[in-house]
Amino acid sequence: MAEFFPEIPKIQFEGKESTNPLAFRFYDPNEVIDGKPLKDHLKFSVAFWHTFVNEGRDPFGDPTAERPWNRFSDPMDKAFARVDALFEFCEKLNIEYFCFHDRDIAPEGKTLRETNKILDKVVERIKERMKDSNVKLLWGTANLFSHPRYMHGAATTCSADVFAYAAAQVKKALEITKELGGEGYVFWGGREGYETLLNTDLGLELENLARFLRMAVEYAKKIGFTGQFLIEPKPKEPTKHQYDFDVATAYAFLKNHGLDEYFKFNIEANHATLAGHTFQHELRMARILGKLGSIDANQGDLLLGWDTDQFPTNIYDTTLAMYEVIKAGGFTKGGLNFDAKVRRASYKVEDLFIGHIAGMDTFALGFKIAYKLAKDGVFDKFIEEKYRSFKEGIGKEIVEGKTDFEKLEEYIIDKEDIELPSGKQEYLESLLNSYIVKTIAELR
């Protein structure tokens, strides 16, 4: 089979001093940390949509990307070419997972029946390529936002016919995700929300969204799909207000409808930015709720108000993100999916590789720093000391539910001064810097 990327070699680890843009500086997939290869800690994944479908189009300009599969004019030939290119791409980068929307991998037909038949043909091609590869499916999902039929939403639409279409589309997406051995299935509600409350039945939409998710849970059980269901929060874009605004909002919704036991969260860095949170905040919220499932790895631009989906190169963000993953016990049915696209002006094929290499190196380095932070317990020790008052005396009684307002008033009413510990934020931020510098210095 002819190569799609003949000019790109298999990417090797060359160490931190390397200046080769097509080499890893910090990511050695077989490096063993805490008894496990680095690749199994990180579980990198390629996003089919950004890497093989995005062509550099934006609202102000035409496509710019030079892609080898664009030489195919027939939609099916192009779909098969993209699949073949995916496996070559993953193997050259030593990435073992990929993710997709149903409409990324196959074109739509005139009816859903025809579309499903087309999809089946592409799935067969993927299965054929999987036989000779170690590349696996991390998670699948359905695109319920691009087609005009979803202008009012999918599960939250005003049209029962559209609701039925969306349900049938998710049914098929679940089937092919199971068929391909996917570890999870993602629900992202890009059109599940509203532009104005003047024309919105908020109660009905939220109830229908719960009904939709409950049907998905029931069908997954029926077909024996044991992958992890994941909600991907995002506050806005393309819809003005989306119902899965952030982890806290989405968790409250799931809890309210008795669905929380079936779902975890797929946290995207840029979505946290849009919600006014840090990436770590969303990961921490998911972790303390026991709902940290997977990550869409990217970064946003704080000076822009939209989802820029840039490759992650901020070492502070990746360090603190991996710190939360480590504290959560690591990934099980999840991983680091690069929901990131090269910039429109980075239009060469090699830029696809360079972008992924940059992200993989940054997360690998972040993991190594985070591992040292977690192992040394530097933040844990400080936090434990800061909240020490709740480990003894009246504080312990508060935590154990052995006191009340009257007793607390009696305890405090004659105290003159309360001595508080210092937050020492500046010291802790400086300590984080020290760990970053020290870890890099110790690397070969």
From Swiss-Prot:
The active site is at H101, D104. Keywords: Carbohydrate metabolism, Cytoplasm, Isomerase, Magnesium, Metal-binding, Xylose metabolism. Pfam families: AP_endonuc_2 (PF01261). Binds 2 magnesium ions per subunit. Its cofactor is Mg(2+). One of its GO terms (cellular component) is cytoplasm. It catalyses: alpha-D-xylose = alpha-D-xylulofuranose. PROSITE patterns: XYLOSE_ISOMERASE. Its main location: cytoplasm. It is found in: Cytoplasm. Mg(2+) 1 binds at E232, E268, D296, D339. Mg(2+) 2 binds at E268, H271, D307, D309. GO terms for molecular function: magnesium ion binding; xylose isomerase activity. One of its GO terms (biological process) is D-xylose catabolic process. It is an enzyme of class 5 (isomerase). Its EC number is 5.3.1.5. NCBIfam families: PRK05474.1, xylose_isom_A. Belongs to the xylose isomerase family. HAMAP family: Xylose_isom_A. Homotetramer. PANTHER family: PTHR48408, XYLOSE ISOMERASE. This is Xylose isomerase.
